[in-house]
Amino acid sequence: MLPPWTLGLLLLATVRGKEVCYGQLGCFSDEKPWAGTLQRPVKLLPWSPEDIDTRFLLYTNENPNNFQLITGTEPDTIEASNFQLDRKTRFIIHGFLDKAEDSWPSDMCKKMFEVEKVNCICVDWRHGSRAMYTQAVQNIRVVGAETAFLIQALSTQLGYSLEDVHVIGHSLGAHTAAEAGRRLGGRVGRITGLDPAGPCFQDEPEEVRLDPSDAVFVDVIHTDSSPIVPSLGFGMSQKVGHLDFFPNGGKEMPGCKKNVLSTITDIDGIWEGIGGFVSCNHLRSFEYYSSSVLNPDGFLGYPCASYDEFQESKCFPCPAEGCPKMGHYADQFKGKTSAVEQTFFLNTGESGNFTSWRYKISVTLSGKEKVNGYIRIALYGSNENSKQYEIFKGSLKPDASHTCAIDVDFNVGKIQKVKFLWNKRGINLSEPKLGASQITVQSGEDGTEYNFCSSDTVEENVLQSLYPC
């Protein structure tokens, strides 16, 4: 079925195929699957390299604040730079209407420098990205070709290993990374897709979009996977990697308001008064990745068939082989390339560093009478103490047990005690006492269980402390 958003564009489609050639980058056609399809009815050719004006900005631990311009067509620029052959190289490619200089890609490089020695190359193709979306979709073919040309130059001119190359791309940048990887025969070590763009790519042939064959290892973070119509989702719901992560279900991110108008965030001063907008959900993917560099343990992805099953704790705790870390350290997962389209879910925090640690709480009640109300617990750990989390609301019956999963924004450490609180709902003329006889806390990461006991009962809104049994 023809996507509704393409109906108007279909009227502009042309029939006759055309081709344009750009020297060492090769030739580019407007034939299928690149154009003239249901998703891509408008037949367009990519702009020239001169018009796109792609720049490769090299940052290293030696020059974290000031980039060095390098290019594959002039190997001397690489040899004269701080590029180090004994380090990994991470390319970061921005998406539609965005830029790399003085923006999130260069900030991400700086975070990497805190944990590793690395060549960090930001790919700035702002001129090609600030076009009509359908034109920008075609322009990434040239940017991908230029990126592949530079990587090939590193290999042939300097003997650099393709397996040490990691290409990170956001939105259209994810498919740009795919084009580079495809041109290099899928031999680059890793590609990370940060909410790969959906329009013009969802369900399209592998040749035009990101897929697992584009690199030795492909990991993907989906944060805005609702349909473009009517939800204005800019990402893909399609699984396109070896590991596909769907934080918070992959559609609505905590801290991003659901009202369409209020979820719109402008880029670069609304592109100097002219350009378009991207959604908060779409941006979250690179924010999560960036945070994961310094907070590797706060983004564990749980293998699960669906987000609903994950929320119901049907995929808890992590299996014996462990859970992969979404983001920078996903490549540490032993089973990363054992299959394609491996699916993982997790919840994140609303703001700050977005980290989250998942626990399953089981509470057994004690007392003498049934009360209608709710119960809350707080964790007290060797690192920090958590806020109170609601575990259950409804009929509170003595000897009844209630189980709930919670997501804590930080690592509390070894849990030393828990505190229980209850409150009644509605009118109750008596002054009942209720307590928790046992609370079990299970860690999602390794399945460790902590058991706490008490024989006390307390009045409403009075904290009860439970210690190890």
UniProtKB/Swiss-Prot annotation:
Annotated tissue distribution: Pancreas.
Class of this enzyme: hydrolase
InterPro entries: AB_hydrolase_fold, Lipase, Lipase_LIPH, Lipase_N, Lipase_panc, PLAT/LH2_dom, PLAT/LH2_dom_sf, TAG_lipase
Keywords for this protein: Calcium, Cell projection, Cytoplasmic vesicle, Disulfide bond, Glycoprotein, Hydrolase, Lipid degradation, Lipid metabolism, Membrane, Metal-binding, Secreted, Signal
Activity control: Regulated by CLPS and bile salts levels ranging 1-5 mM in neonates and 2-30 mM in healthy adults. CLPS stimulates milk fat digestion in the presence of 4 mM bile salts. Triacylglycerol lipase activity toward short- and medium-chain triglycerides is inhibited by increasing concentrations of bile salts and weakly reactivated by CLPS. Optimal triacylglycerol lipase activity is reached at bile salts concentrations ranging from 0.1 to 0.5 mM and then decreases at concentrations higher than 1 mM.
Effect recorded for residue 353 to Q: Loss of N-glycosylation
Protein name per its UniProtKB record: Pancreatic lipase-related protein 2
